[in-house]
Amino acid sequence: MVMIWFDMDGTIANLYGVDNWLPMLREYNPAPYAEAEVMLNMSLLARYLNKLQTVGYGIGIISWLSKNSTTEYDEAVTAAKLGWLNQHLKSVDFDKIHIVDYGTPKTSFRETDEDILFDDEERNREEWGDDSYLPNDIIEQLKNLLKDAE
C-alpha cells in the first residue's frame, strides 16, 4: 500500500507560531505541541484523506520528538501530539503514527518507492527524493492523487 506521510511541526501544526515555543521546549514544557494552531483547513484535509483511504492509500504521521529531551518529556510530547491529532483530525483513522527521536531519518519509514511525504524541512524532502512536498502543496497534491485514482 502506498503511504501518504505527514510531518506535524511546521507542516500541519504551527508549532513555530506559538509564542515562546523555543524557551518552553527548552524548559521541557510540552504545551506548544498541544497549543499549535492548524496550518490548513483541517476539515478539507480530513475529507481528502478519508477519500484517499477508500481508494487504497495509507495515511501516516512521521514526527520528531523535541531536540532536547528526557524519557518523561518524550512521553509528554507524544501525548500532546496524539492529542493534537485527535482534536484536529478526529475523523481520520491513521494507518500508522511514528513519533520518533529528533533527527531520525524519515526515509527509514518509507514502505514503497511511491510513498509521499509532506514536510517543511528541506533536508527531509531532499533525502526522500521524488514525491516529497512542501506544506503549501498538500491540498493540491491530494486533489491530484484523487483525480488520478478515479
Per-region residue spans from a language model:
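A structural signal for isolated positions on well-ordered beta-strands in alpha/beta enzyme cores
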Residues: 58-60, 98, 116
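Lumenal/extracellular "mature" regions of secretory-pathway glycan-modifying transferases
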Residues: 76-79, 92-99
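Structural motif
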Residues: 3-4, 116
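Alpha-helical substrate-recognition element adjacent to the catalytic core
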Residues: 5, 9-84, 88
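Structural alpha-beta junctions
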Residues: 54-56, 86-96, 130-135
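Conserved beta-strand termini and adjacent loop/short-helix elements that scaffold enzyme active sites
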Residues: 62, 99-102, 135-136
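Donor nucleotide-activated moiety binding/catalytic core segment of transferases
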Residues: 95-114
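Acidic, Mg2+-coordinating phosphoryl-transfer loop and its flanking beta/alpha structural elements
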Residues: 112-150
